[in-house]
Structure formats: structure tokens, C-alpha cells
Swiss-Prot record:
Swiss-Prot/TrEMBL keywords: Cell membrane, Ion transport, Membrane, Nickel, Nickel transport, Transmembrane, Transmembrane helix, Transport
Compartmental location: Cell membrane
GO biological process: nickel cation transport; transmembrane transport
Main location group: membrane
Official protein name in the record: Nickel import system permease protein NikC
Species assigned in the record: Staphylococcus aureus (strain MRSA252)
Pfam families assigned: BPD_transp_1 (PF00528)
Family affiliation: Belongs to the binding-protein-dependent transport system permease family. OppBC subfamily.
Bilayer-crossing regions: 10-30, 73-93, 108-128, 186-206, 238-258
Stretches assigned to the ABC transmembrane type-1 domain: 69-258
Function according to Swiss-Prot or TrEMBL: Part of the ABC transporter complex NikABCDE (Opp2) involved in nickel import. Probably responsible for the translocation of the substrate across the membrane.
Signal peptide: none
Length: 276
């Protein structure tokens, strides 16, 4: 048991260090260098001046990856915020109000989750002009369902507990019950799901950009860089390997962090149940 939580603490440290490094590096690179074309320096090899070399337009690859992190992570955070707001709100009302609202939401979720997520995202993104902002809409439309289902499940388990019954008996406003009493109960589980989904959403954004439905040139974004590097996989593989490696490492870190948070949450719930 001690080894498990020691491992989890190490994961949390790596996660924090990764976020810290990504933030600090933003201050050492210029966004202008990520988009400025310099045809006299195309395909420069790896050096102290260009840590990962340059691309076919003479742009520094390391700079583009760091600036691309800003685009990818910002859109991911924005998407998660939209997903959580919609999903948790619907889940709270569906779990509390019951009746036709709950049935309608559940039937919609059953239909939505019966279709592969990525297929729906591609279909939705195809209706819009390719951009990162449209990816936010396309991903949010399908991903909120998991949060609604999780929230409703937790609310259902809390509804028969004495503190909720007492609040209803004393005619406490529904808004107060939802915000002050039920919302704190769902926050830990929602945070775990958010961290796990963070890696998934990065993968979705990168994949949609890779097939031309997301970020467009010259915007530095990891998926768009993969698409660009695909054409030079034989002659200059670093253009493909660099963004692919960053995507893989980022997803791995967030997935491991999500697993560690889930372990800690389950441990806390176990201790709570034993004490009650």
C-alpha cells in the first residue's frame, strides 16, 4: 500500500513539473518565430540554435512545439470547461428532479453513446469551417454525456441520505441544495474524470487537426504539425517524431495522473465508509 501511494506521489510530482516546465518555456520563445517564414534556413539540422532543427519553411521546430502547446492546451481546457458546465448542470437536474427530465436526458445519452465518439466529432467538424474553435463545439457536443451520467449517478446515491431529506423537509431552495449540498459531493469524481479526459481531448484535437478539420497553417498546433511532418517522414523524420512524442508524453502523464487521483479518491471513500 505504501508503495502504491509513493508511486502516486511521484506521478503528481511529474505532473506538476511538466505543467511548470511548459509554462516557463512560454517565456523563452517568441510566437513570431513559430510562424515567420525564413526560406534561407529550411531543414536546418539539430543544433544549439535550433534544438529540434527547422521545418520546410525555416521555422524553428522547438519553438513551434512550445507555442503549439499553448494552442492545444488552451483549447483542451476551454473544451473541458464547456463539457463540465453542461454535463454537471444536466446531471444535477436529471438526478434531482427525476420524472420526464431524467428519462429524456438518459434516452438522449443512450443514443449518443451508442455511436463512436470520434465518428460524431468528425461529422460535426465537417459541417464547420476548419478551426480550433469549431473543435471545441464538436467535442463538447458528445463528451458532456459522460459527465451528466456520472453526476446523475452520484446525485441518485445522495438523494436518500438524511441531510438531503432534512433540507427538503425545511423547504430549502432547490438551487441551494444543488449548489451547496450536492455539488461538493460530485467534485472529486468530476476532477478525476477531467484529468483522464484531458489526455483524450488532446488526442481528439490533434487527430482532427491531423485530418485537416482543426488548426490551419500557419497556426502551430501539435496535430497540424503531424500533418505537415507526414510529407517529410523519410527525409526529415524529426518533423513527425517531435510532435508525436510530445502528444504521447502529454497524454501518458495525464492518464497516469488520472489513475493516481482515482486511487486516492477510492482510498478516501474506503476510509470514510469504515469510519461510518
Amino acid at each position: 500500500m505504501h508503495k502504491i501511494f509513493s508511486k502516486n506521489n511521484l506521478i503528481f510530482f511529474v505532473f506538476g513539473a511538466f505543467i511548470f516546465v511548459m509554462i516557463v518555456l512560454q517565456f523563452f520563445v517568441s510566437s513570431e518565430n513559430a510562424t515567420k517564414v525564413n526560406l534561407s534556413q529550411t531543414f536546418e539540422p539539430i543544433s544549439w540554435l535550433h534544438l529540434l532543427g527547422t521545418d520546410d519553411y525555416g521555422r524553428d521546430l522547438f519553438t513551434r512545439i512550445i507555442i503549439g502547446a499553448r494552442s492545444t492546451l488552451f483549447v483542451t481546457v476551454l473544451t473541458l470547461i464547456a463539457i463540465v458546465v453542461i454535463g454537471v448542470t444536466l446531471g444535477l437536474f436529471a438526478g434531482y428532479k427525476k420524472g420526464w427530465i431524467e428519462r429524456l436526458v438518459l434516452r438522449f445519452i443512450d443514443v449518443g453513446l451508442s455511436i463512436p465518439e470520434f465518428i460524431i466529432m468528425i461529422a460535426l467538424a465537417s459541417f464547420f469551417q476548419p478551426s480550433l474553435w469549431n473543435l471545441v463545439i464538436s467535442i463538447t457536443v458528445i463528451k458532456w454525456m459522460n459527465y451528466t451520467r456520472l453526476t446523475r449517478s452520484i446525485v441518485n446515491s445522495e438523494m436518500n441520505k438524511p441531510y438531503i431529506k432534512m433540507a427538503q423537509l425545511f423547504h430549502v431552495p432547490i438551487r441551494t441544495i444543488l449548489i451547496r449540498h450536492l455539488t461538493p459531493k460530485i467534485i472529486p469524481a468530476i476532477i478525476v474524470l477531467m484529468v483522464v479526459d484531458f489526455g483524450k481531448i488532446i488526442l481528439y484535437i490533434s487527430s482532427l487537426s491531423f485530418i485537416g478539420l482543426g488548426a490551419q497553417p500557419p497556426t502551430p498546433e501539435w496535430g497540424a504539425m503531424l500533418q505537415q511532418g507526414r510529407d517529410f517522414i523519410s527525409s526529415h523524420p524529426i518533423m513527425l517524431i517531435a510532435p508525436a512524442s510530445v502528444i504521447a508524453i502529454t497524454i501518458l502523464i495525464f492518464n497516469l495522473t488520472g489513475d493516481a487521483l482515482r486511487d486516492r479518491l477510492l482510498k478516501q471513500r474506503g476510509e470514510y465508509n469504515e469510519s461510518h
